[in-house]
């Protein structure tokens, strides 16, 4: 396969300068650096078409004589397909040409004679005809033409000649522009109808590239002897007829190829010829690079005498079974029909017709022919060529960094992905992305988690659409990779069975939610809760009689304090029906509104329980009116929301409330699930029990959970070792809507994490590990503050940071406490950093971490275990214990405010006027002043004004004297002398004395 054409080669072919061609390529949108750059074939074709008009005119003028002259001497045309070659072999083959025989080297005449016949017949029509005029013009041309005819009939009398003539005729119809000038020393370009041979030889790319090699030698007659004994004008460095010996052996008498071409035709490099007079070396000359004198003797008389360019490899169809010679210097394979032995650098490759193709040379790489070395068997596909061509287009450069062009492609990245992840997606270098982002003003390392905005910014610069995958979508894709799905019942309608409703009790703090559940369960839970408020989700399943039918209902009790927003939202998502408890004596409160919004967001029907109607100040009608503003219109007002007036304390109308819940479940909801599938559920709460380990409160939503199942819950996994119901009794299996406490996980899952039964522990571990890694990346991206070059100085300044370690009795409480603390609004000079969080007692590990990071441990409903207390005392670690969440929030907020830098304000304490100035060699200028009001103190800060303009700020009173005695302060109405730190003073200057006083911060 020929090499790619270079810019300067194409410019010579088109007859223009390289500079003009570079300018045209740039106008056409092609990215080419210099004149030595290679050009893809499609671009070459476009340039040839662009300059086609001028090129065609030149070729026509040269083609007309070439076509006209061969028409008359028909025998010459047939004999001159290889102008010089047929004539010379004809001499030994036909006796009428003794001169040719004498001119040929001794002993070499018989071989070329035989070889010449297939060569003459094998000459392709297009290249052959242009050569005919060059042979016909000289007076001696007709004789060798006549002698050439018997030479054609050597291998196959008659037939070969007949086939050779039709093969030559097409050459006349498609004349070669330079065929005529060959004897006159003019250029010998390739046939105009063909594309130029593309190779590394800069002298062989155009039709006009071969003029100089045949200067002053004059036209070589078609029948003239080959310069075996006489000098050849242009081939001084070439022995014999190596090239033409191979060319003559192209086809045998039957038109088949005899020997492979020495160079481009077979894919291997051609031996270089000797130095040519005009600098144009014949690529296939017989100089002894890969061959020896044998090559010259093997085909001495086959040097072609015409000026035509030999055909390019593309024009010569390969003959089956003839492969390129592999060893350097060995002859090619012989022809198929009889004839002389194949000519090459060594012995001929066969006894058949045409000359055998010369062996591969030792490999002259570079400008003369194809590259040296082993032949390249593979060819680039169209896709590879297209990719290379596209890569040559103007690249995407950001700040000197070359980056790929996305061309609008969409890249999906997980939240918290790093630049290394981005680079893997687009096949780029992560270091290049880091440098590009630095040039855009962002400082990020390759492995650090990057915010969504930064990823999208970088993607836009590279023409990529970065799509940050939401955690839900990412988790769904993760499960799909394991052929798992969450949230859908398996099987058909026949597999579904009715399940109990899950009811969440929501409302404002102290409105009676837990007391209502106590009344329903006939238990007393609220009395055991700290501060009388619920600080976690409790799950209970009770059996109640509704209209003489026993029904099972699962209740979830959510906290009402504002810090437990996430718990209420989680409870709403895990439920079928929401019971909104509103105190009749208190009305609609902020958490009431929030609970309404959570229920509406989860598309959950609401039943309103107006509690505390037994109090004298209760006003149920007022509650109905207030809730109407939030879209909860009572049925008696024409709406669809059920309102029930109850008293949880007295137990009034509780049965009516339960009946309303069951009615809503039956009328509005189709509560069914498949109990036979693998269990799926949600962990509504989790905590670390000292004796039992991690314990998760789970509600099974579909399927049946059994002891021994392999489960994954969030980023934790394990096997169900034990299940306990709300009464502490062991259960072996839990069906849909059943709340149970599960033991056996390797850690404490997050509240609200999905629980899924998988095939084995291995799958569970893989899912949990991937979720854990994703969680860490997302947390790191969220907590990392973006640092740009503009705010680098402010970031490097010292800030006051309060480090906290949070420990709680369950995951929900820790989550609520963390979110509440992070919502505290503080100035930028004070930062809150939660370095660790966990469920369970305070351990020695927590104390060690706190001591190393100077952190405070917040223990919520837990105590220190073992020697943790002793270590905390020894290390000076502050451990704070709380049982009510809002007290922890208040103290942390106070601590943050105490860390703020004090605020100072200026307070004026006196004024003085300079009445006289004295000079003292030891101290300089002394100002004699009169204190007008207030006091003047030594070392106080002063402001000096002159004619109403401040001339000195923050000057100091270095020395103060009253009469001749040193004084600490001087009161109004007295004279004094003072030495100021500001020397440029004059009479009548005003001195204002002030001090900076710390003022308390506003709460």
UniProtKB/Swiss-Prot annotation:
One of the essential components for the initiation of protein synthesis. Protects formylmethionyl-tRNA from spontaneous hydrolysis and promotes its binding to the 30S ribosomal subunits. Also involved in the hydrolysis of GTP during the formation of the 70S ribosomal complex. GO terms for molecular function: GTP binding; GTPase activity; translation initiation factor activity. It comes from the Bacteria. The keyword Cytoplasm applies. It is found in: Cytoplasm. InterPro entries: EF-G-like_DII, IF2_II, IF2_N, P-loop_NTPase, Small_GTP-bd, T_Tr_GTP-bd_dom, TF_IF2_bacterial-like, TIF_IF2. Residues 36-392 are annotated as: Disordered. Residues 532-536 are annotated as: G2. Residues 231-243, 255-271, 329-372 have a biased composition (Gly residues). It comes from Corynebacterium glutamicum (strain R). Residues 62-151, 273-286 have a biased composition (Low complexity). Its main location: cytoplasm. Residues 498-670 form the tr-type G domain. GTP binds at residues 507-514, 557-561, 611-614. Residues 376-385 have a biased composition (Basic residues). Residues 507-514 are annotated as: G1. This is Translation initiation factor IF-2. The gene is infB. Residues 647-649 are annotated as: G5. Residues 557-560 are annotated as: G3. HAMAP family: IF_2_B (MF_00100_B). Residues 611-614 are annotated as: G4. Residues 178-190, 213-230 have a biased composition (Pro residues).
């Amino acid at each position: 396969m020929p090499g790619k054409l270079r810019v300067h080669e194409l410019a010579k072919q088109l007859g223009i300068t390289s500079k003009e061609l570079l300018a045209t390529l740039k106008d056409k949108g092609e990215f080419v650096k210099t004149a030595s750059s290679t050009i893809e074939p499609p671009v070459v074709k476009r340039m040839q078409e662009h300059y086609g008009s001028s090129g065609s005119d030149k070729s026509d003028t040269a083609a007309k004589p070439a076509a006209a002259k061969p028409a008359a001497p028909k025998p010459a045309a047939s004999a001159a397909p290889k102008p010089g070659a047929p004539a010379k072999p004809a001499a030994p083959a036909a006796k009428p040409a003794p001169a040719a025989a004498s001119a040929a080297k001794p002993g070499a005449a018989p071989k070329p004679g035989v070889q010449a016949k297939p060569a003459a017949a094998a000459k392709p029509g297009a290249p052959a005809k242009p050569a005919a005029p060059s042979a016909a013009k000289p007076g001696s041309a007709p004789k060798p033409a006549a002698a050439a005819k018997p030479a054609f009939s050597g291998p196959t009398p008659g037939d070969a000649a007949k086939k050779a003539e039709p093969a030559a005729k097409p050459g006349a119809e498609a004349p070669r522009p330079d065929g005529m000038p060959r004897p006159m020393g003019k250029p010998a370009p390739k046939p105009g109808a063909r594309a130029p041979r593309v190779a590394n030889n800069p002298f062989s790319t155009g039709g006009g590239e071969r003029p100089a090699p045949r200067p002053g030698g004059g036209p070589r007659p078609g029948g003239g002897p080959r310069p075996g004994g006489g000098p050849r004008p242009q081939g001084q460095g070439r022995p014999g007829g190596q090239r033409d010996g191979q060319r003559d052996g192209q086809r045998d008498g039957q038109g088949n190829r005899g020997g492979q071409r020495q160079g481009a035709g077979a894919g291997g490099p051609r031996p270089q010829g000797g130095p040519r007079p005009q600098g144009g070396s014949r690529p296939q000359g017989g100089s002894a690079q890969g061959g020896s004198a044998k090559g010259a003797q093997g085909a001495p008389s086959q040097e072609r005498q015409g000026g035509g360019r030999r055909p390019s490899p593309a024009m010569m169809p390969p003959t089956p079974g003839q492969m390129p010679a592999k060893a350097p210097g060995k002859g090619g394979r012989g022809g198929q029909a009889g004839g002389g032995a194949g000519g090459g650098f060594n012995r001929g490759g066969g006894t058949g017709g045409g000359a055998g193709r010369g062996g591969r040379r030792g490999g002259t790489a570079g400008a003369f022919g194809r590259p040296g070395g082993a032949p390249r068997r593979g060819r680039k596909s169209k896709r590879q060529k297209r990719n290379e061509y596209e890569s040559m287009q103007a690249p995407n450069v950001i700040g000197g960094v070359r980056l790929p062009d996305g061309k609008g492609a969409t890249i999906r990245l997980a939240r918290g992905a790093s630049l290394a992840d981005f680079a893997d997606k687009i096949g780029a270098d992560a270091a290049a992305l880091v440098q590009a982002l630095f040039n855009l003003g962002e400082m990020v390392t390759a492995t650090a988690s990057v915010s969504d905005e930064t990823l999208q910014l970088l993607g836009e610069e590279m023409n990529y659409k970065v799509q940050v995958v939401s955690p839900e979508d990412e988790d769904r894709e993760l499960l799909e990779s394991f052929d798992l799905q969450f949230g859908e019942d398996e099987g058909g309608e026949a597999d579904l069975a009715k399940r109990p409703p899950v009811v969440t009790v929501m409302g404002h703090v102290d409105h009676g939610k837990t007391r209502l559940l106590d009344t329903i369960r006939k238990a007393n839970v609220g009395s055991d809760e700290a501060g009388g408020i619920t600080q976690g989700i409790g799950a209970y399943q009770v059996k109640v009689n509704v209209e003489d039918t026993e029904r099972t209902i699962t209740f979830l009790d959510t906290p009402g304090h504002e810090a437990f927003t996430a718990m209420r939202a989680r409870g709403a998502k895990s439920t079928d029906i929401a019971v909104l408890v509103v105190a009749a004596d208190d009305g609609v409160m902020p958490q009431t509104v929030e609970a309404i919004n959570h229920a509406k967001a989860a598309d959950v029907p609401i039943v309103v329980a107006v509690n505390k109607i037994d109090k004298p100040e209760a006003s149920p009608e007022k509650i109905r009116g207030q809730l109407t503003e939030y879209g909860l219109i009572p049925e008696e007002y024409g709406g669809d929301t059920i309102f029930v007036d109850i008293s949880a304390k007295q137990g009034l109308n509780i049965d009516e409330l339960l009946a309303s819940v069951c009615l809503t479940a039956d009328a509005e909801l189709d509560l069914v699930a498949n109990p036979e599938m693998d269990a799926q559920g949600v962990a509504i709460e989790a905590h670390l029990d000292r004796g039992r380990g991690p314990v998760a409160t789970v509600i099974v939503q579909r399927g049946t959970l059994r002891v021994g199942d392999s489960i994954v819950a969030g980023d934790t996994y394990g096997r169900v070792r034990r299940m306990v119901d709300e009464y502490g009794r062991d259960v072996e299996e839990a069906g849909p809507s059943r709340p149970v406490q599960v033991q056996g996980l390797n850690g404490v899952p997050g509240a609200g994490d999905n629980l899924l039964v998988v095939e084995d522990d291995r799958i569970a571990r893989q899912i949990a590990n991937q979720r854990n890694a994703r969680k860490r990346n997302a947390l790191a991206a969220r907590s990392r503050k973006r640092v740009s070059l503009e705010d680098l100085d402010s970031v490097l300044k010292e800030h006051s940071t309060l480090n906290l370690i949070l420990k709680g009795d369950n995951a929900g409480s820790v989550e609520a406490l963390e979110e509440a603390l992070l919502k505290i609004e503080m100035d930028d000079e004070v930062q809150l950093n939660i370095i660790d969080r966990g469920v369970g007692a305070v351990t020695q590990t927590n104390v060690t971490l706190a001591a190393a990071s100077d952190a405070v441990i917040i223990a919520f409903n837990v105590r220190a275990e073992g020697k943790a207390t002793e270590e905390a005392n020894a290390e000076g670690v502050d451990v704070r214990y709380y049982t009510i969440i809002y007290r922890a929030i208040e103290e942390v907020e106070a601590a943050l405010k105490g860390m703020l830098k004090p605020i100072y304000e200026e307070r004026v304490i006196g004024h003085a006027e300079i009445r006289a100035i004295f000079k003292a060699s030891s101290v300089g200028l002394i100002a004699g002043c009169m204190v007008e009001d207030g006091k003047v103190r030594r070392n106080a800060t002063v402001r000096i004004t002159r004619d109403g303009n401040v001339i000195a700020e923050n000057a100091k009173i270095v020395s103060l004297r009253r009469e001749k005695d040193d004084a600490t302060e001087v009161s109004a109405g007295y004279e004094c002398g003072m030495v100021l730190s500001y020397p440029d003073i004059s009479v009548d200057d005003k001195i204002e004395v002030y001090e900076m006083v710390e003022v308390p911060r506003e709460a």
